[in-house]
A protein has these predicted regions:
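Residue-level signature of transmembrane alpha-helical entry/exit and packing/kink sites
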Residues: 1-4, 8, 116-125, 132, ...
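Small-residue-rich helix-interface/hinge motifs
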Residues: 3-101, 401-423
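Alpha-helical transmembrane signal-anchor/signal-peptide segments
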Residues: 30-35, 147-164, 169
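Internal alpha-helical transmembrane segments
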Residues: 64, 89-159
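Juxtamembrane extramembrane loops of integral membrane proteins
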Residues: 71-78, 158-219
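Functional transmembrane alpha-helices
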Residues: 103-119, 224-248, 256, 263-398, ...
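PDZ/PDZ-like peptide-tail recognition elements
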Residues: 122-155, 188-241, 247, 284-286, ...
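Conserved PDZ fold ligand-binding element
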Residues: 163-185, 246-269, 334
Length: 431
């Protein structure tokens, strides 16, 4: 667990550091003096001054900072911008003046962030999120170049299902659902999760030819045996409901299910299926926890449920692709995560997602622990690849979230700069 915490810290630290490096490199390219570029935060361990910049290593190796001359300390109005009435702003903020004068003793005022053109400032601020997208792209190339991509190939079609009635067959590759491009298996899963009842106009490829069909999900009520857990990637316990059969039996979030009554889960025989087939009798479940096999006894409970059923699924098997396709698929991979984050933010505003659906640092550590434990049987390289996949998601997430037009975020600053472009002069800074 300690190792996984360290991995999570390094991951988040790398993502934040690359974000700040984006600001740094574009600021330098635009002639802005970077007062300090630091790795980590907290007390400074040591620093080296080179040119305008002091390069620092700080105590806590988590993230970094890029502090530019004139960024926050030198304002637009300090450099001669006008207030709303076109008059010079008169300032009696002596502490601010003293800070400004102290800085100008050591730096050329022309190198201040605030002294640069609005388009230079926009480029500098936008560079942080852009570098996050570039980091996500680099890791996507590593992943797809190593193990391939996961096209939305139909891996199962149940008899007498809506999918079977629509003519879908195993091996068909879905490319569009309701005019939404589908490049990956996970895109279908995301779409179905939030549009389960929608009729799907599907475009798919079969033997090199394109076809279209319509799948209308079937609403049905079910009586099924359940444990009160949610499963991720077929074997991982993603959550355990309070006071459920699983909770009472000692099953924990993060457990990896090895077998149920001696039956190992497969893509064709998934855990919910195995549990439901028990008929409510006590079953023996073997889970892997902290590298050890743990055997538990649990009795499923009968649950009334309802669902919209299509009768087909895609398991996300990886397929190797050419170098050119690797680059193209990597762009699409980053685009998928950007789109997913944007849609998720929209769902928060519409109430489809709540604050409890967000993950903070503790959630990241839990996820890393889960990813590592689940990947261990496949070897160290697959552990790394799964961590890289998590970096792709987190880096794209940070890039998008930083572009939101909110105070203290890059997006909030960019909003005022674009207003400046329209107005032809800076927005007055409120005291």
């Amino acid at each position: 667990m300690i190792l996984n915490i360290i991995i999570a810290i390094i991951m988040i630290g790398l993502i934040v550091l690359i974000h700040e490096f984006g600001h740094f490199i574009v600021a330098k390219a635009n002639g802005v003096a970077v007062v300090e570029f630091s790795i980590g935060f907290g007390p400074k361990l040591f620093g080296i001054k080179k040119g305008d910049t002091e390069y620092c290593l700080k105590l806590i190796p988590f993230g970094g900072a890029c502090i530019m001359l004139g960024d926050d300390m030198l304002t637009q109005s300090d450099d001669g911008s006008e207030d709303e009435n076109g008059e010079d702003e008169d300032s009696d903020d002596l502490p601010a003046k003293e800070r400004r004068e102290e800085l100008l003793k050591n730096y050329d005022a022309d190198k201040a962030f605030a002294a640069k053109t609005v388009w230079s400032r926009i480029a500098i601020i936008a560079a942080g999120p852009v570098f996050n997208f570039l980091l996500a792209f680099v890791f996507a190339v590593i992943i797809i170049g190593s193990v391939g991509t996961d096209p939305c190939t139909v891996d199962v079609v149940e008899d007498s299902s809506p999918a079977a009635a629509a003519g879908l067959q195993v091996g068909d590759e879905i490319t569009k659902i309701n005019n939404n491009g589908i490049a990956f298996s996970k895109e279908y899963a995301f779409y179905q999760a939030y549009h389960a009842s929608d009729t799907m106009n599907i475009t798919y490829k079969r033997d090199g030819q394109k076809y279209t069909t319509t799948v209308t999900p079937e609403y049905r009520k079910l009586s099924v045996y359940r444990l009160g857990i949610t499963i991720s990637d077929n074997t991982l316990v993603a959550s355990v409901s309070d006071n459920s059969a699983a909770s009472k039996a000692g099953i924990e979030k993060g457990d990896v299910i090895v077998s149920v009554d001696g039956v190992k889960p497969t893509d064709d025989n998934k855990i919910p299926q195995i549990i439901n087939n028990s008929g409510g009798k006590e079953i023996e479940m073997v889970v892997k926890r902290d590298g050890q096999d743990v055997t538990l006894k649990v009795t499923p409970t009968l649950v009334e449920s309802e669902e919209y059923y299509t009768g087909f699924d895609s398991y996300g098997y990886r397929v190797k692709v050419s170098p050119a396709q690797t680059i193209l698929c990597s762009f699409k991979e980053v685009g998928y995560w950007i789109e997913t984050v944007v849609k998720s933010v929209g769902m928060m505003f519409t109430g489809k997602l709540g604050i409890n659906d967000l993950s903070g640092p503790v959630g990241v550590v839990d996820s890393v622990n889960t990813v590592v434990e689940q990947s261990k049987p496949d070897g160290a390289w697959y552990v790394c690849l799964n961590i890289f996949q998590y970096i792709v998601m987190l880096s794209a997430n940070l890039g998008v979230m930083n572009l939101l037009p909110l105070p203290a975020l890059d997006g909030g600053r960019l909003l005022f700069m674009f207003i400046e472009v329209v107005r032809g002069k800076p927005v007055k800074k409120e005291r």
